[in-house]
Amino acid sequence: MSKFLTALLIIVSTNVFSWDQRPPLPVQQCSFHSPYGFAATTRQATAICREAYLVAYDAPAKIPVYVAYTLKPENALGCFPRTNAFVADNSLPPGKKASPQDYAGTGYDQGHIVPDGDQSYNQQVEWESFLMSNMSPQLPNLNRGVWKQLESSVRAWAVQRNHTLIVIPGNIYNVATNKKIGKSGVTVPDGLFKIVIDTQTNEALAFAYAQKESQPTDISLGQVSVADIERYTGITFALPKGVDKNAKPKIWAADLGALGKAKKAKCGKDD
């Protein structure tokens, strides 16, 4: 290998993986992402406040219990390119965190809980979306299928309704019995969930999807109630006053084609 090519590979590797890992912020600075109150869980969760999201991280499982973040309409059309800067979270002690190597050769994606596409309006927050404390093992068909479809739909809702959303995604799992991968013993969740709250209408949609090798990409097939997710996870969610946790409201319209055109018009590329 030429010296030039070797140097180029080193530069590329450094640019992708060696970004500025800033210390977590005080947790109360993330109350903006939980305006109705923090969700309560009986799991051994460590609250970590990042620039643009709050993660309740389960160190024994080495995956998030849940994450909460705010998605403003103007931020749903971010233009910073995807970096794939997956990296272990340096704020967590040894033995309490996952690394990209834990996923290698397992057949599972390093699956985002807070999606990169919702964080691409700022370089620092885009990088922080690739912290391994924001990942869980996800089968490719789930991560790149219906889960990705839901992520795009959430962005479309923010832009097309022109409303700020509170989004709470997370994992469904049993740390004692679920499969583990990698040297660190990363728990493979049984499924994923997402709650989306419209801060103007005080409506809440909820979805849950199982880890399956094959499933349709129709997000409506995974619609559940918030109460269902509470039963699946043991988490108690704080919602706007008057929201019925047992309800399954009509899913909001989402024009993904229009979202892609808006993204291309602003950034020169599709969603």
Feature map (PLM): residue ranges:
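Short, His- and charge-rich active-site/binding loops that engage polyanionic ligands
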Residues: 47-110
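Domain-level detector of nuclease and nuclease-like folds
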Residues: 90-271
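N-terminal module-boundary/linker segments of secreted carbohydrate-active enzymes
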Residues: 17-64, 244, 250-251, 266-271
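Generic hydrophobic, helix-prone segments enriched in Leu/Val/Ile
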Residues: 2, 32, 86, 154-156
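Sec-dependent signal peptide recognition
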Residues: 2-9
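N-terminal signal peptide c-region/cleavage motif recognized by signal peptidases
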Residues: 13-15
